[in-house]
Amino acid sequence: MKIWFLLFTTMVVALYAYEPLDSTDKKLEAEFEKHKVKEVYKGEIKIPNSYKKDEEGLYRDKFGKFVSNQQDFYVNFAGKYMIVTHSCGTSCYYRTVEDLSAGKSVKIEGMDKFDNTETRPLFKDSEMGGFAKLYTREDSDLLMARYVNFDTDVCKQEYFVLKTLKNGKKKLKRISKRTPCDTPIE
């Protein structure tokens, strides 16, 4: 059982971990710079109560499911948020956004488009499915999503920015079309 858990954990971390972009991608770095937030939260990280450490010291969500980020809570998006990937079974995952300055989950309209669940598959025409890898920076409200289809190895990408609506709700606004990966943003 432990071997399966370690294998699954390794796969999830490899596929869904948020990693910094290659610094040679100057155009994308410039785009992140265009969408800088006013301030990055540097205070005490407040982990929402819905996360608990198990006997092995790994974070699990309120359903007891493994949380696939690097098992450390840190700001990785738009100044005070962390995007967290949750396991819901084999090749099944969904994401939540946590406000680490307040220790609470935040509903962001459009975030579920990056999920891969039974009721909302990322690739409806794919037998094997795929995954969406998200690229973010702590000091920017820009989010780049790359979608990889396991059946075809086709990679597509698109860009979004986090917007706060007049009613106070948050929404991801798409600012590009879905294009082949490594296409510079226009």
Whereabouts are the PLM-identified features?
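Short consensus segments that form the blades of beta-propeller domains
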Residues: 85-89, 123, 150-153
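Extracellular/luminal recognition modules and glycoprotein regions
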Residues: 53-71, 76-77
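Sec-dependent N-terminal signal peptides
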Residues: 4-13
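Acidic, small-residue rich beta-repeat scaffolds with periodic aromatic anchors
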Residues: 4, 17-52, 129-186
